[in-house]
Amino acid sequence: MITVIKWLVSGCCALAAVTTRAPLPKDCRNTPNSRGCWKDGFDILTDYTDPKRAPPGKLVEYNLTVSQQVIAPDGYEKLGMVANGQFPGPTIEADWGDTIRISVYNNFTDNNNGSAIHWHGLRQFENNVQDGVPGVTQCPSKPGETQVYEFRATQYGTSWYHSHFSLQCECPLNGLFGPIVIHGPSSMDWDEDLGPWLLHDWYHDDVFSLLWVGETKNRGAIPESTILNGKGKFDCNHHNDTRCTGTGGEYFEVNFRKGVRYKFTIANTGTLLEYMFWIDGHNLTVIAADFVPIEPYVTDVVNVAMGQRYEIIVEANADFTHGSNFWIYAQYCDEVDLLPHKAVGIVRYDEQDRQDPRTPPLSDQHRDFGCEDPDLDNLVPVVQQSVGRRVNRMEMKDYLRMGQEGYPDPMNFDGDLHKWVLGDVPMFVDWKNPSLKKLAVDEHPDFPPETVPILLDFDTGDWVHFVITNNYTFEKVHFPRNLTPVMHPMHLHGHDFAILAQGRGEFDPSIVPKLDNPPRRDVVNVDTGSYVWIAFQVNNPGAWLLHCHIAFHVSSGLSLQFIEQPKKVKPLMEAAGVLGEFHDRCAKWTEYYDSVNIPDNHTIDDSGI
């Protein structure tokens, strides 16, 4: 057994990442019975939290053309946004340590949309300019323009890419997203990889009409369907709409063989709904949360909030008493009967047996499971890391309080229109003047209040702590008040964060945080009436977004940005040789935007991200 290294905390110093697993042979190879191995000198025990310790890799190149076309994933035709004509878009695939170069051509010539692609969960270490957030890390690319993103895969696991350009392209509302797979070691052995399973809610209506539903009625618009890997079912029998094709779509299907250990990653790429996910008749062994390998734990159901990913192993050992076909389920965690179809796919042990699986009655467990993240005790990182003392303030006035306020008058709670906030004001960005432009040009950058900046001008290795609250029961005490009791999956760009505490009710400052190897991930669900205490190291200069991954909420302003080590940003961009291209894109976008939008009096209808 390897010796556990524990470094003493002195002030705010960073602590070493360690592991208590037995070391692996130096010459081991990645096989079905040794998935913890990878390449010479690199395995599941390697400290991937240090981006500079990634294995040597190769250059992997992809070309994506983003455009509009009619799609019907659930049997109902709508105008959607696709990558290379595919929905979901093609898989971006590489090995841990590879450099990934992706050329994105904006072919939105028919709707005048800009484009910017975010690579969800990838840290972009010392490479903020590649994060793909318009108004924060870049100006959008105009129609007819190609933008080249290039970054190193310093983490491994499965995630996804998606547009971050306003609600017009946001997430799966219109379809512009696809999977990212970074191959690496696993914390448990498996036989066959089934790849990414992208799960999301699907809407038929115009996206901005849906946003107005949430901002005026204080309740998110209900989706028509649930889609798994681009396939779903919608009942056309009760609709005379000619866009309903009559076939009602199709289920996602996968074939199992008895005794085989299958690995896949379930990712919620959705807009509004957090899903309970399970496969009838099978247990799920969870081996990673987001991009963090964890000690395996067994469950029969897992909640997946928007933006979250869980790497799962399923052993094909089902009981055939009631047949050899089994439903794959995804239901909304809060209202189990909200959507007509809970079944989203089929596992078949016999390809020739085309019957639908038996549908057992919904158990009390599946009705009352709730919307909380997995217990923190289950999310134990394989590579351990202890959290140091904070260097920032964490008084009650510093809490990041989620809620709604009146708009345009924030004190008019009884008006028709409301915006979401994470603190004092809803976030709005300027596509022509992103935060990174200020950091790269201005000696003393000035950030408007509506860009919601939080300055992290600390030394490399310092730890910062934040409390995020979603306690709607205190609407008469705290400002802003939350008119809508709903969970919020909070996603941080540029970092994994440690979860030091999570619970219901008002946050108590006397709570003892979990500092010794707490769970780490990049999306945490802050359930209704709850709080979460997170921490991360200051080590990645740039402007990094923290936002709710409910598309309607981020579009309505529920975001902020951390301005991290601002004086180091410009030197990093100069060293990378990207300043010229960065400014050139902004100049082209400004000229294009002014020529197209100002004459027609078009303005940004939402936060811009």
Swiss-Prot record:
Tissues where this protein is expressed: Specifically expressed in conidia.
Domain of life: Eukaryota
GO MF term list: copper ion binding; oxidoreductase activity
Broad class of enzyme this protein falls into: oxidoreductase
Name assigned to this protein: Oxidoreductase tpcJ
Organism annotation: Aspergillus fumigatus (strain ATCC MYA-4609 / CBS 101355 / FGSC A1100 / Af293)
Entries under InterPro entries matching the protein: Cu-oxidase-like_N (IPR011707), Cu-oxidase_2nd (IPR001117), Cu-oxidase_C (IPR011706), Cu-oxidase_fam (IPR045087), Cu_oxidase_CS (IPR033138), Cu_oxidase_Cu_BS (IPR002355), Cupredoxin (IPR008972)
Entry keyword set: Copper, Glycoprotein, Metal-binding, Oxidoreductase, Repeat, Signal
GO biological process: secondary metabolite biosynthetic process
